[in-house]
């Protein structure tokens, strides 16, 4: 992969976007960015606080702005938030400004990977499985719509998935 084109990772929470993104960026000698981390840096507060104070709608407005800004960078690997594809504008920007890889995983893996994470406001409920199932129903088609590639992450290490993505990009 001679040119350093942007790589955008989309998928549900717990799919491994941040972990795989770090491996991918390191192996490709690219900068790694995480849209949720950038939102926290810009607001000076964590995502849960933004959700509490501004609600999901306020968070999504911030997220759309961050996606717009970050997708204009060059030579980055970007891990997006699980809900970033809700915005048509964000989907258009992701598609137009880089290669989009959908990291797909099962509800069971999502539950296992997120069960102790208190930084996920949508999962602060007694029924996280139901929430994840509802989110999958709402978002999976959007992930597929925006993606150039789909990679299943269930039983593979982040390093293996990163290598699979690199191989796909080299064959492109």
UniProtKB/Swiss-Prot annotation:
One of its GO terms (molecular function) is ATP binding. PROSITE patterns: SHIKIMATE_KINASE. GO terms for cellular component: cytosol. ATP binds at residues 14-19, 120, 156. Catalyzes the specific phosphorylation of the 3-hydroxyl group of shikimic acid using ATP as a cosubstrate. Monomer. This is Shikimate kinase. It comes from Aliivibrio salmonicida (strain LFI1238). The gene is aroK.
């Amino acid at each position: 992969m001679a040119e350093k084109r942007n790589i955008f990772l989309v998928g549900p929470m717990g799919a491994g976007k941040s972990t795989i993104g770090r491996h991918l960026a390191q192996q490709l000698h690219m900068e790694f960015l995480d849209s949720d981390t950038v939102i926290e840096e810009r607001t000076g507060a964590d995502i849960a606080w933004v959700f509490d104070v501004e609600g999901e709608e306020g968070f999504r407005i911030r997220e759309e702005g961050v996606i717009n800004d970050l997708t204009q960078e060059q030579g980055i690997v970007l891990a997006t938030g699980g809900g970033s594809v809700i915005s048509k504008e964000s989907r258009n920007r992701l598609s137009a400004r880089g290669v989009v890889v959908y990291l797909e995983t099962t509800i069971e893996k999502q539950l296992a990977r997120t069960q102790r994470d208190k930084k996920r406001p949508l999962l602060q409920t007694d029924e996280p499985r139901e929430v994840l199932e509802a989110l999958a129903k709402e978002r999976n088609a959007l992930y597929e719509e925006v993606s150039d590639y789909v990679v299943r992450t269930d039983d593979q290490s982040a390093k293996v998935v990163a290598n699979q993505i690199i191989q796909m990009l080299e064959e492109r």
